[in-house]
Amino acid sequence: MYLSLLKSLNRLSPRAWDFIQLTRIDKPIGIYLLLWPTLWAVWIAGKGSPSLKTVFIFVVGVFLMRAAGCVINDFADRKVDGHVKRTEQRPLISGKVSSREALALFAVLVGLSFVLVLFTNATTIWLSFGGLALAACYPFMKRYTYYPQVVLGAAFSWGMPMAFTAETGDLPAAAWLLYIANLLWTVGYDTYYAMVDRDDDLKIGVKSTAVLFGDADRVIILTLQGLALGCLMLAGARFELGACFYIGLLAAAGCFAWEFWSTRQRERDACFKAFLHNHWAGLAIFLGIVADYAVR
């Protein structure tokens, strides 16, 4: 239904689908992976009852900034995407969208996101500049370092401290445990994603943790996921979360175990499915948090 609604826009404007593909709103997995951890922080900051204003700002902000991130990523990769099987038909490569149009769209999306942040407070506004810097520089990191996934993790986690300052005006030390947990988790699942393109990346000299880790990739991913769960357990203790939260963590651990097993042959499709599967881990943790506060 969601995809059909988006495709119906193409009948209104012949170029609409090109921009939908550029922003990847036709592929909501990235929205989910950014949304769930942001909502972890929103719910914990609000002690189970966050303000509707905060929820609205961060849900819409996730949608806008994920779209902006996809646009700037494709702009940064416009000279290499044509050499990668998975990305060779993207709008900037096919010429359906120009570089100037992509940059203009990026500016509009960032501007709309900043308007949302203006409805919070000074601390959150200042923090938003850090998030923008991370989102803008991430796509270029794969040219210079084998750790672009770490920069992505930092960017994807930046909404968490912002959620605390927006909801409470304060940033407790334990909030950084959530930040570190999500950073570790993001590096793990995005390494699965990078494993899909590893053969192409090796040919064209693109760097990633998948290239760096080599045959140790799956073990390192599982270790990162385990460390993320450990940080979440520590955060749960600091925020006095109860049994439902830990059941959510157990469900997430089950997701991670399935991903490890299913990628044992390192087939492209299996690695991509493992990446997609992380959405369920994030959702399980969020539902655990919501349930924990609901039963009090």
Curated annotation (Swiss-Prot):
Its main location: membrane. The keyword Cell inner membrane applies. It holds the Pfam family UbiA. It comes from the Bacteria. Pathway: Cofactor biosynthesis; ubiquinone biosynthesis. One of its GO terms (biological process) is ubiquinone biosynthetic process. InterPro entries: HB_polyprenyltransferase-like, Prenyltransferase, UbiA_prenyltransferase, UbiA_sf. The keyword Membrane applies. The chain crosses the membrane at residues 28-48, 52-72, 102-122, 146-166, 169-189, 219-239, 241-261, 275-295. GO terms for molecular function: 4-hydroxybenzoate polyprenyltransferase activity. Its EC number is 2.5.1.39. It is found in: Cell inner membrane. Catalyzes the prenylation of para-hydroxybenzoate (PHB) with an all-trans polyprenyl group. Mediates the second step in the final reaction sequence of ubiquinone-8 (UQ-8) biosynthesis, which is the condensation of the polyisoprenoid side chain with PHB, generating the first membrane-bound Q intermediate 3-octaprenyl-4-hydroxybenzoate. This is 4-hydroxybenzoate octaprenyltransferase. It comes from Pseudomonas savastanoi pv. phaseolicola (strain 1448A / Race 6). The gene is ubiA.
